[in-house]
Amino acid sequence: MIKLAASTLVFLLTLVLTTASSSSGQSLLADKVIVIDPGHGGIYPGAVHNGIREATVNLAVALKVRDRLAATGAAVILTRTTDTNLAAPGASLADDLQARVDVAKTAGADIFISLHANADENVTAAGVIGFFPAGRPDDLARALKDGAVHGTAAVDGGVRPANFYVLRNSEIPAALLEMGFLTCPEEAACLSEDTYQNQLAEGIVKGIITYFQDH
């Protein structure tokens, strides 16, 4: 009876903490506008390795993040919801990237997050990496990276400054998250699995909540 009571107490305590965390996230994000950018798409497939297209992985995770964020009351906007590029036919890659930045600007977004999958000549390269605009704070990138790493037990690739178009041209807090390496067979397999994508999405949402707790 004592063991049963103890286990029941642990369960109830876990339930209370989980509920409190969920409620906190809901109240914290209720008035936030968040733009999620699934990198690449359409004529820009991104990295293609081990039979997996980066654009497909990016979109799959982004949709899962959107659904979880929507449950918190946040206004969530995806730059794309299908396998398409954003710029008009005949436009340049820069035009496509600018169109993604413009989505956030038009929406009056609070943060901009671009999701990607990495590639490297070294097939053992692995891990989640958060990129932030050079010369600006790294807190959003760090929160996202930490959330994704804790959610998946992936290799922690740290955070790094970068001059990527969508970062340097964003006027709001922005981060680009490399969710893993498609050139690494083990990570490629994980990134294509629904269960792992769900874990990534959960971690990313927790990272967003952590970011707004400090801002």
Predicted regions mapped to residue ranges:
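Active-site-adjacent mobile loop/cap segments within catalytic or ligand-binding domains
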Residues: D102, A107, S114-N122, G158-H215
